[in-house]
């Protein structure tokens, strides 16, 4: 099977590196679809809503701007004790509160459970986006590991005893919310 080339609309170098790594190493057989990713950074409007709403609108706008098919991503970190917040607003919560502040949000609650959610959207100009979602369960903990990739140091994956930041890249990429969403994307294009 040949290679599919996709444009990933992101300005986040860490996300791009991780997506390329996941898609280049997660090929289970010679017949599996290989996906090559290029990136383009665009200033897209950030709509408010669910990760699905955000991913749909970002991908529509991006496909129109670049004049071709593309993928976009929206990520959420949903605290069970807070009914799913900060959810898709995690980027702004992290910028304003920092890792320690996110932990403090859960003080007084009995649960530190959280879901990491990733929604990729594939869109061609003038067409409806196709969504691919992945989720990983875990808990919010005091920061452990390198602090150079968003909220990775405070999200401890259930059953591992480690935060995303503490894991070797191969381990994180085998069980992360992002890898689960990308696996669904790969399956979709493998069936085409």
UniProtKB/Swiss-Prot annotation:
Its cofactor is Mg(2+); Mn(2+). Binds 1 divalent metal cation per subunit; can use either Mg(2+) or Mn(2+). InterPro entries: ITPase, ITPase-like_fam, RdgB/HAM1. Keywords: Cytoplasm, Hydrolase, Magnesium, Manganese, Metal-binding, Nucleotide metabolism, Nucleotide-binding, Nucleus. The keyword Nucleus applies. Its EC number is 3.6.1.66. It is found in: Cytoplasm; Nucleus. One of its GO terms (molecular function) is XTP diphosphatase activity. Its main location: cytoplasm. It catalyses: ITP + H2O = IMP + diphosphate + H(+); dITP + H2O = dIMP + diphosphate + H(+); XTP + H2O = XMP + diphosphate + H(+). Mg(2+) binds at residue 46. It is an enzyme of class 3 (hydrolase). It comes from the Eukaryota. ITP binds at residues 10-15, 58, 74-75, 91, 149-152, 172, 177-178. Signal peptide: none annotated. SUPFAM superfamilies: ITPase-like. One of its GO terms (cellular component) is cytoplasm. GO terms for biological process: deoxyribonucleoside triphosphate catabolic process; nucleoside triphosphate catabolic process; nucleotide metabolic process. It holds the Pfam family Ham1p_like. Belongs to the HAM1 NTPase family. Homodimer. Pyrophosphatase that hydrolyzes non-canonical purine nucleotides such as inosine triphosphate (ITP), deoxyinosine triphosphate (dITP) or xanthosine 5'-triphosphate (XTP) to their respective monophosphate derivatives. The enzyme does not distinguish between the deoxy- and ribose forms. Probably excludes non-canonical purines from RNA and DNA precursor pools, thus preventing their incorporation into RNA and DNA and avoiding chromosomal lesions. This is Inosine triphosphate pyrophosphatase. It comes from Puccinia graminis f. sp. tritici (strain CRL 75-36-700-3 / race SCCL) (Black stem rust fungus).
């Amino acid at each position: 099977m040949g290679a599919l080339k996709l444009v990933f609309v992101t300005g986040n170098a860490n996300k791009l590196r991780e997506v390329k790594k996941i898609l280049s190493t997660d090929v289970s057989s010679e017949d599996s679809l290989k996906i090559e990713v290029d990136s383009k950074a665009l200033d897209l409007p950030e709509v408010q809503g669910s990760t699905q709403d955000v991913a749909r609108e970002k991908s529509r706008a991006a496909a129109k701007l670049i004049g071709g098919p593309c993928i976009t991503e929206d990520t959420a970190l949903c605290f069970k004790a807070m009914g799913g917040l900060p959810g898709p607003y995690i980027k702004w919560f992290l910028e304003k509160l920092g890792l320690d502040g996110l932990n403090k949000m859960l003080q007084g609650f009995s649960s530190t459970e959280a879901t990491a959610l990733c929604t990729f959207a594939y869109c061609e100009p003038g067409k409806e986006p196709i969504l691919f979602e992945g989720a990983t369960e875990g808990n919010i903990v005091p920061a452990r590991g390198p602090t150079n990739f968003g909220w990775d140091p405070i999200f401890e994956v259930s059953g591992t005893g480690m935060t995303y930041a503490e894991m070797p890249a191969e381990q994180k990429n085998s069980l992360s919310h992002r890898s689960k969403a990308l696996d669904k994307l790969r399956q979709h294009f493998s069936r085409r």
